Amino acid sequence: PGIGAIHTQSYYTENNQLNAQNRMLAGDSPEEIINWLVANDVSSNPDIRQYGIIDFNNGSPRSAAFTGENCFDYKNHVLGLNYAIQGNILLGQQIIDSMESRFNNTSGCLSDKLMGAMQGANVVGADTRCMSEGTSSLSAFLRVAKPNDDPNAIFIDLNIAGTPQGIEPLDELQVEYNNWKNNNNYDCSTQGI
């Protein structure tokens, strides 16, 4: 919290995530962290990994991403000044493009924009493994920390780990997020994030 965000996926290993966090705490830029991860992958196989990293850099955000050539297709990432969006096993580039458009065009605070971006992937089979389930994804989560949050007790930590067949995880996460906002009388115009 207060420094940036790191997301590792595609053959996720906790050690790579922890190494990335340690590099960020040591002051490395997002690009330096990715270069380090590629050179020091815990399994010596960075081509199956995917990373997205942003940092605040004292008010001048930076972003970087990496998509290994052996991640499952369709795979890609896109970067903006204050975001990194990545995906693999996708229907196609249109999923990433939709997420980016929704992030950029959703008003509100960061959590609203992140939720909007995820809704941009709310298409049956966006993750092609889920086509037969009639859903976009296997699970969905939203984690947002305030700058001074304890890493083990962050401001928003919602997780839909799985749903019965045909129940959309992103819709369930949207309900959880809306309930969280209502239950906490959350107004990002006055409370930030």
Task: Place the predicted regions along the sequence by residue.
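N-terminal nucleophile
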Residues: P1-I193
